[in-house]
Amino acid sequence: MADPGAVKETVLLLDEPTGEKVSKTELKKRLKSRAKEAEKQKKAATAPTKIQKETSSEQDEANLSAHQYFEIRSNRINKLRETKNSYPYPHKFEVTNDLRDFLTVYKNLAKGEERTDVPIRIAGRIYTKRVSGNKLVFYDIRAEGVKVQVMCQAQNSTTGFEEQHEVLRRGDIVGIVGFPGRTSPKTRDNGELSIFATQVVLLSPCLHALPSEHYGFQDKEQRFRQRYLDLIINDRPRQIFRTRAKIVSYLRSYLDSRDFTEVETPMMNAIAGGATASPFVTHHNDLKRDLFMRVAPELYLKMLVVGGLERVYEIGKQFRNEGIDLTHSPEFTTCEFYQAYADYNDLMAMTEDLISSMVKHITGGYETTFESQTGQVYTINWQSPWKRIDMIPALEEACGDKFPPGDQLHTPEAGTFLKEMLKKMKVECTPPLTNARMLDKLVGEFVEDKCINPTFVTGHPQMMSPLAKAHRDTPGICERFEVFVTTKELLNAYTELNDPFDQRMRFEEQANQKAQGDDEAQMVDENFCQALEYGLPPTGGWGMGIDRLTMFLTNNYSIKEVLAFPMMKDDKADGEKKEAIVKTGTAEDGSVQL
């Protein structure tokens, strides 16, 4: 007997023209739509096939839904796939010219000048198509972020003019063979630099109707899910990813020039160590044990320094099983480096030099603008020297009370004091209320908010920094600094703890915090402790979030804008795939941009 509580499974049927599996209801709709289209084509079968008729067809396509457009276009391209002479997905097209170079080299051509002696072969995507009668078609082609007009005249065509152009639509990737020139319009003074095409080759058709340039593609949710379409329509993400690449390139160049060695360390570990964070857990079938995706590469990098690689760095992914918000992603990119015989004072000087010179190199100056989610606009001055704030004195000034000495901040009495401070200052802290978490919450409220221009925050208690070396002068404090910009953390560094006895005690304290319910506390890593027993030289360690710096230098308050493919929540659309309503625009001459 069937289970009355069971969910009835939807039966999907094959839609042969598109190769999709759809519901019975959807299939009926499509068959009916095709029957109407077939009847329309039958009536028009005797009409001569002229480019004006195709233009009318393109205008009709403006009224189609996204699915209808896809179906008609797919059918047309499938027919081309069956032919031998005009296969729409050729293996090769020889490109001899970069579009950016073309615009630079030929920008000074005179009005009406045509260089028929200069062969040009470029490729790009069609953004607009404008038809002017049977013998003239204009295209705007884009590649590598730049645009050029392509002028196609029947008199210049080396192959069938109508056959070349009637199949092309907005979004298609095409190869252009022609020569450079400047148009000679009657109503304009200078004309427009163009490629006068002798042949246009379809290299890869776009089966979907693109959003028009007029309405654009601005929905953030869809832009992140369809980053390829975002890049096709919008130029800003291209510039963001180029800036990100420049940041990574500059970091490598800077460190390589200072005799650092780039290394790679494991992404999966038996113990989640190197940072205070919640890890992702995976399982290795052959080893029959759980592994942790790394939260930081720190411990491995320091073991390499123990082995004699005195200057090492790694640029790579980290994974933290924590909340997703405007500034945090579960998968993110960092740069960490470790330098033997350096301390946190050396690293502060190096940080100022590295970041300020990088900003100057990438942006051309030391000042950038950053707009927060609330619309507050900051002007950030990256030029050194940077401001420095001592954590505990700053908290005492903000709270109006004397805090316990650094070597007493881990005690139960200090815990009681911190709870009173939270209550007095009306600050909420989520459990577990460990001393480290409460102090960190107060710092976030009253110290970090003062950091607009790049600011060093120093004087962290040892209980907040299990891998940092104790301060040489102040008990209970460690030699650590963080850099904050517009109230957000950018990087973290310290003089590394190289005392194996002290390190083991710190790990045990972290284990106690984990027992109290702090999931982010670190576990004891015996392998790392053993490595320290062989001797780690005095070392400075440094780590920076590349995503966060990219946000600052590209003026983006959301981390998803600087990630090519950010982590997204499930799309909750029910039933059939949502049909996007694609708005198409019309050119000034009345031709439809498809």
UniProtKB/Swiss-Prot annotation:
CDD domains: LysRS_core, LysRS_N
Record's keyword annotation contains ATP-binding: yes
PROSITE patterns xrefs: AA_TRNA_LIGASE_II
One protein family per Pfam: tRNA-synt_2
Region described as Disordered: 1-62
Entry superkingdom: Eukaryota
Biased composition, class Basic and acidic residues, residue ranges: 18-42
Record bears the keyword Nucleotide-binding: yes
Molecular-function annotations in GO: ATP binding; lysine-tRNA ligase activity; tRNA binding
Keywords in alphabetical order: Aminoacyl-tRNA synthetase, ATP-binding, Ligase, Nucleotide-binding, Protein biosynthesis
GO cellular component: cytosol
EC number, as in UniProt: 6.1.1.6
Biological process according to GO: lysyl-tRNA aminoacylation
Disulfide bonds: none
Enzyme class: ligase
Substrates-to-products reaction catalysed: tRNA(Lys) + L-lysine + ATP = L-lysyl-tRNA(Lys) + AMP + diphosphate
Subunit structure: Homodimer.
Family per record: Belongs to the class-II aminoacyl-tRNA synthetase family.
Function as written in the Swiss-Prot or TrEMBL entry: Involved in self-resistance to cladosporin since this product is an inhibitor of lysyl-tRNA synthetase. Cla4 may not be inhibited by cladosporin, thereby imparting cladosporin resistance. When cladosporin biosynthesis is switched on, transcription of cla4 will then be necessary for continued protein synthesis in C.cladosporioides.
Protein name: Lysine--tRNA ligase cla4
Species whose genome carries this gene: Cladosporium cladosporioides
Gene name tied to this protein: cla4
